[in-house]
């Protein structure tokens, strides 16, 4: 079925829908990972984005139950050079086209993804639309121009959990905290603020011995403190960090007397809470092959990344840079000089990607132990 991808600057590509008829729009970006498409599809941080995979063949190992990062597909649309309809993998339960059809998400193949990637790299991420229903490029370009830009959007509140849940036996278990929460105290009490968390973050925090309770992004500081946590964790998530005023205000309060860590959007929220400024990157960092330097050890780590925004802490005298991106030298991590506060912009939990930076969770565990004795 013929489909057209049209961008707001007038550029368009003709291809074929591998998910049937439909129309979908969002911010067009590219991901440089060769594998890991299932984790990409289910990462809440991709909400509102049409993801172009730079590797030419996607879908050859199908879809597995074990590799999802949230309860549903979050991308606005999926763009590939060629989609494999007949996967080969003993764990696979369905093909990529079947998975996207079931989720109601548009998929397009047969376009020149290399040309699209180069265009986005040169001109920046931009609004776009994919359609099988309207095949007039000019009309689609006009539609793309009407879509909201990523800047100014609070998407975290659209993907956060509706209720609190504990992470138990490798899965989220809803809990009622209206009358308080009974901790088992088998480990430090960790409240994770869910801005669109990936499940592998929860798995690795659990492995470190934390007793993890996740709360929705709209939870107030008073509600969080009523749970009597030993530490706070700010998760990854989608959208513009500069509009999350309440989240930044809450984080600033937590930093006064609690150990705090953040990943991705959580890193940006923490950075702003401590005096930094958020800004949008030209085309973002999306993929599992981004080189990052640990500024203390000078070790180079290959990291999994997914962010379109960054934070500038150059005017924050209380913070030190712990990680730097070697491609564009943007900030990838910081720590407070005197308080148990650390954050990184990339994804140490991988899923997909290398495990070079998994030590982040152990590092936070040690900070919490030193601060609380637990």
From Swiss-Prot:
The organism's place on the tree of life at top rank: Bacteria
PROSITE patterns: GATASE_TYPE_1
Amino acids binding L-glutamine: 45, 237, 239, 265, 268, 306, 308-309
Domain Glutamine amidotransferase type-1: 189-374
Pfam family, one: CPSase_sm_chain
GO molecular function: ATP binding; carbamoyl-phosphate synthase (glutamine-hydrolyzing) activity; glutaminase activity
GO biological process assignments: 'de novo' pyrimidine nucleobase biosynthetic process; 'de novo' UMP biosynthetic process; glutamine metabolic process; L-arginine biosynthetic process
Region annotation (CPSase) ranges: 1-185
HAMAP family the UniProt entry points to: CPSase_S_chain
Family: Belongs to the CarA family.
Function (record text): Small subunit of the glutamine-dependent carbamoyl phosphate synthetase (CPSase). CPSase catalyzes the formation of carbamoyl phosphate from the ammonia moiety of glutamine, carbonate, and phosphate donated by ATP, constituting the first step of 2 biosynthetic pathways, one leading to arginine and/or urea and the other to pyrimidine nucleotides. The small subunit (glutamine amidotransferase) binds and cleaves glutamine to supply the large subunit with the substrate ammonia.
Protein's UniProt name: Carbamoyl phosphate synthase small chain
Organism of provenance: Maridesulfovibrio salexigens (strain ATCC 14822 / DSM 2638 / NCIMB 8403 / VKM B-1763)
